[in-house]
């Protein structure tokens, strides 16, 4: 695990991820506290894509893939899973810090008809966990299929554009991968947005279950 951490968390990735979170909390203005989580989710999806797209293909770019292929499929699969886990944990910790930075740099007000601050944060943590998981797994999967980090990022970006828009909201409804962002914040009892997160979780787990077969192909 320590060796995998050194591979997937080099200094430059940590620096640009932290810089991204700081800049986001400075430039994206919010008025009410409920807007903080909604503001963070879509940009962090893109960060997860860029951050995790090279989870395996860096082996190809660094010419380590020939050595990597000598290992059993199970060991190679576990290696990729460990890398994804390490990156996701880092991104989730950063997402929590980013949430706090909005309160540090700005002074959002509590909306009178929304949940309590702790409830809002709890919902945000659950939603952003699924978001980071889904986009990181998808980015790695597409990169492995096309054997190109840029193709993986490009494919994810197309889905991001299609779903993170008013058209996407109307088309996908509660099944939108960004259902948390588009949910009715003034109606806490409306939990239909969980359908979108359940879909993300299902697809992400399915892609992980198919990972050994994908490893065999490369």
Where are these regions (language model features)?
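Hydrophobic core of alpha-helical transmembrane segments in multi-pass integral membrane proteins
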Residues: 17-27, 92-101, 157, 197-211
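Secondary-structure boundary/capping residues
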Residues: 14, 65, 76, 150-151
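Aromatic- and glycine-rich beta-strand/loop motifs that create alpha-glucan
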Residues: 1-14
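Juxtamembrane/interfacial segments around transmembrane helices
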Residues: 63-74, 95-101, 135-143, 173-185, ...
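Terminal transmembrane helical anchor/hairpin motif
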Residues: 30-32, 115, 150-218
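Helix-loop-helix units of permease transmembrane domains in multi-pass membrane transporters
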Residues: 53-89
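Secretory targeting signals
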Residues: 20-54, 80-152, 187
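Juxtamembrane transmembrane-helix termini
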Residues: 57-61, 108-109, 147, 170, ...
């Amino acid at each position: 695990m320590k060796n995998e951490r050194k591979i997937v968390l080099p200094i430059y990735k940590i620096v640009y991820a932290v810089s991204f979170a700081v800049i986001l909390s400075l430039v994206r203005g919010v008025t009410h506290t409920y807007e903080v989580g909604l503001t963070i989710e879509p940009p962090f999806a893109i960060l997860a894509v860029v951050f995790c797209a090279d989870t395996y293909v860096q082996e190809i770019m660094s010419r380590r893939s020939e050595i990597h292929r000598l290992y059993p499929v199970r060991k190679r699969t576990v290696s990729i899973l460990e890398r994804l886990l390490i990156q996701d944990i880092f991104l989730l910790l950063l997402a929590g810090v980013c949430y706090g930075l909005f309160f540090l740099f700005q002074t959002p007000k509590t909306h009178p008809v929304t949940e309590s601050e702790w409830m809002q944060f709890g919902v945000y943590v659950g939603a952003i966990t699924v978001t980071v998981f889904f986009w990181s797994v998808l980015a790695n999967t597409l990169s492995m299929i096309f054997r190109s980090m840029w193709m993986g990022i490009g494919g994810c970006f197309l889905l991001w554009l299609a779903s993170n828009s008013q058209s996407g909201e109307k088309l996908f409804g509660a099944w939108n991968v960004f259902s948390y962002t588009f949910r009715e914040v003034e109606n806490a009892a409306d939990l239909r947005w969980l359908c979108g997160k359940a879909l993300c979780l299902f697809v992400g787990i399915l892609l992980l279950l198919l990972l050994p077969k994908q490893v065999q192909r490369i």
